[in-house]
Amino acid sequence: MDTQALCGLKAADFQKEIGGKKTDLYILRNANGCEVAITNYGGALVAIMVPDRKGQFANVIQGHDNIDDCVNSPEPFLSTLVGRYGNRIAKGKFQLNGKEYHLAVNNGPNHLHGGPTGFHARVWDAEQIDNHTLVLRYVSAYYEEGFPGELTMTVRYTWTDDNELVIDYRGTTNKKTVVNMTSHGFFSLQGIGNPTPTAMDTICEI
């Protein structure tokens, strides 16, 4: 929780109580001075500050500047965690062990990215272990958004000295269920500008 973050974001702008739980801003730093800024509302990435080939730092991920914009975003999955189930489940239903489950729908007749109040819209319990590591925890109740089983999720963000952001997802459940978590990052490798540049001049090596 650093008000002098390289990204310019302020912890105070992310501090609010939502549903009885407090939101905040967490800054991870590595030995290179690079930063990742994360809020525990939806586990959203709000800034990733890294240098270009000339050593100029820029934010390369789309994120919001304050908690109110996160909550009221017209793009609710902007760089957030997604769950219980990333992508669409057709017609908002699935079968498991011979039983059909009906889910909350938010994409026409389909269930998308965990539903209207999926993991992206939840306040996670947060523990910053050190400068490099943030651990988020959330317990998804039985039948939340229509899914069977109580699901306990732990997501660990690790920001390495190689400028790698490692996201580790672990879940335990008390009943057979389906889980397909992901992070819905919106990247712009040329840096977030105004207007934001397109990807047409970006060379990506995989």
Residue ranges, per PLM feature:
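An exposed, glycine/acidic-rich loop-and-rim segment of catalytic or binding clefts
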Residues: 2-206
